[in-house]
């Protein structure tokens, strides 16, 4: 299992995460109600302990990031995620292409929100975000 790579100082999360190593956290897009009914949210719920009804934050071996409540809300949620990742250097956060599925955003819209998170050594972003930063 290799869920992450480093190339030229860039930390890249795998596009296909089926299991997690010790200390790895699966970061997925959610809705604020925590109804994890589809996409990566459903996968996180079924496989990594995301709690139904929790729409933001650490649960199980996951971090729920609400993406369905609008761009301004998403920006604030990413800021809170970045703060959480900074407070937990013992964890490795593997970010999926949050917001780019059911929520309907493009990587070009979401990637810039992760600029500060990308500077953290324990945050790995999807290739489609890294290419835009």
Predicted feature descriptions by range:
Residues 1-133:
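Macrodomain-like recognition of ADP-ribose-binding/processing modules
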């Amino acid at each position: 299992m290799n869920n992450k790579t480093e190339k030229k100082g860039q930390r890249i999360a795998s596009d296909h995460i089926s299991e997690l190593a010790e200390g790895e956290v699966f970061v997925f897009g959610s809705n604020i109600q925590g109804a994890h009914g589809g996409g990566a949210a459903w996968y996180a719920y079924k496989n990594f302990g995301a709690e139904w009804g929790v729409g933001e934050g650490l649960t199980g071996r996951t971090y729920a990031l609400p993406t369905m409540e609008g761009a301004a809300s998403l920006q604030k949620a990413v800021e809170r995620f970045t703060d959480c990742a900074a407070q937990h250097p013992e964890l490795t956060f593997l970010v999926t292409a949050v917001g780019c599925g059911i929520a309907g955003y493009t990587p070009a819209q979401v990637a810039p929100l992760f600029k500060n998170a990308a500077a953290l050594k324990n945050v790995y972003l999807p290739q489609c975000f890294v290419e835009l930063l």
